[in-house]
Amino acid sequence: MKPEIKKQIILHLPYLAFAYLFGKVGQAFRLAQGADLSAKLLHIGQGFSAAFASAAPSFHPTDLLIGLAAAVIIRLVVYSKQKNAKKYRKGMEYGTARWGTAADIKPFIDPVFDNNVLLTQTERLMMSNRPKDPKNARNKNILVIGGSGSGKTRFFCKPNIMQLHSSYVITDPKGSLICEVGQLLQRAKYRIAVLNTINFSKSMHYNPFAYLRTEKDILKLVNTIIVNTKGEGAQSTEDFWVKAERLYYTALIGYIHYEAPEEEKNFITLLDMINASDTREDDEDYKNPVDLLFDRLEEREPEHFAVKQYRKYKLAAGKTAKSILISCGARLAPFDIKELRDLMAYDEMELDTIGDKKTALFLIMSDTDSTFNFVIAILQSQLTNLLCDKADDVYGGRLPVHVRFILDEFANIGQIPQFDKLIATIRSREISASIILQSQSQLKAIYRDNADTIVGNCDTMLFLGGKEKTTLKEISEILGKETIDSFNTSENRGKEISHGLNYQKLGKELMTQDEIATMDGGMCILQLRGVRPFFSKKYDITKHPRYKYLSDADKKNTFDVERYIRVQRKKKKQPSAVIAPEEPFDLYEIELSDEDADFIAAE
């Protein structure tokens, strides 16, 4: 039997009982003695006795008609009542908002402590993207909001780094975090990499050209450079110049990638080519050294990617080309600093291995000067695309080691092209992002209309405190309203004094804006998609089992970044440990201080 038919039969069974009952009433009235209505009513008792002498229904036409008519009338009355019934939700008239409990978060916690993202003192989120019950699956993208001094680093970044379950890409304003957690990561056999745009001497080298594989990669690199070096007050009238610059950069980088020797594939070569691209307004036939390079390449490969781009650039007249070159020079002015050119001369980052083995990459940037933040943005953009491509092409869609981006001061990194699309697709590839801001307005200032898309792709929101009005308003609205009881008392004074008492239901925000702004500094608000919000204590890092390895617990655990980089470079220069007896080799003696020798032994 079909479920719908079965449901209708069950629904109408009570009306069959009514038909039976009223059929018996009709039978009793029919069997009662008497010639008229009054006489039958006097003997109705005898009629009921006769009718119910047998439990079998009466099949007399009159009795059946009375029973069926009564059942139909009752069904119509019930239908009318249901259709016009008032909908009462007692205790829920204005809202059902409430704070979450331990039972609400329990399905989302992994029993193994290390396999969780730490959110608050009592709430955690399992790292697995495939829980036993699919309805409990949540992405690991987290939006963390907290004003200055609210503890974004202490209460969120450090606890989650101490979990040691993933590779980490960590933005580190001021460069203090690596010193505090580096010793812990080294003990756990993590490969540590650092890009420092504050002090280049304390940084490993990063060369974006080392990660160019296809023409698409070249276009992405050019786009990231354009987006993050446009300067202040860019006007729509500059569109032509920007497009012309894009063609020029694409042509030069394409030439370098496909034609230059390995040691010349870097920004230094790009700058040298731009500097050699002089023009003469009075001589349209003048050929500079770069023109000659492309002429020779065109003779050999007319359909070369770089040649196609350069042809389009060369459509500009001499005066226009000179203006384009001036724009290029202004855009790449930071590369006039020798330390930056040296930093990006070759690569030590090994970005394409971060999803293969546990790695911690620290991106140190200034929180007061954004001059070199475009370097961080280029790396972030390249890394995200590299990881996604490797997951798809090598590992069948999922990286073997989960990669977590912990992006402190996210608003200061610069704009990562297509980030709104990337954050929507990285979950399935075992990549997640924790976006840390001082207020939501920072995100809107950079990503504008795409800011809401980015927020919408974060299943978790953690508010650590702040007083920015827009943020307070949005959080208060998200928390919703609860229904509360209220009563008013009144007193009327006249010839006689009378008192009144009035009870009513009211709707109240679970937490008003002023309550959020003035909440205790040790408390936070957690919102997980599909779950009631939590008002909980911030995570106490001193209770973490690995806290003792941080410099917070013991200054002896302070990580020496310069020494680590120096030792890593010396190790790379050492000859291979295993050489065949017949294999010729050169032997180099490298002097290490006792301190450096101990450092290597510790690894």
Set out the residue ranges of the language-model regions.
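Basic- and hydrophobic-enriched, low-structure N-terminal and domain-boundary segments
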Residues: 1-150, 154-157, 481, 492-493, ...
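P-loop NTPase motor domains
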Residues: 21-27, 135-431, 446, 451, ...
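Conserved ATP-driven motor cores of ASCE-family P-loop NTPases powering translocation/secretion/packaging/pilus
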Residues: 423-525
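A residue-identity detector for tryptophan
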Residues: 20, 99, 241, 487, ...
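Short alpha-helical interface patches
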Residues: 51-54, 63-116, 215-225, 272-276, ...
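Conserved long hydrophobic alpha-helices within structured protein cores
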Residues: 113-119, 374-382, 475
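A short glycine-/small-residue-rich loop at the edge of a beta-strand within enzyme catalytic domains
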Residues: 106-108, 113, 374, 410, ...
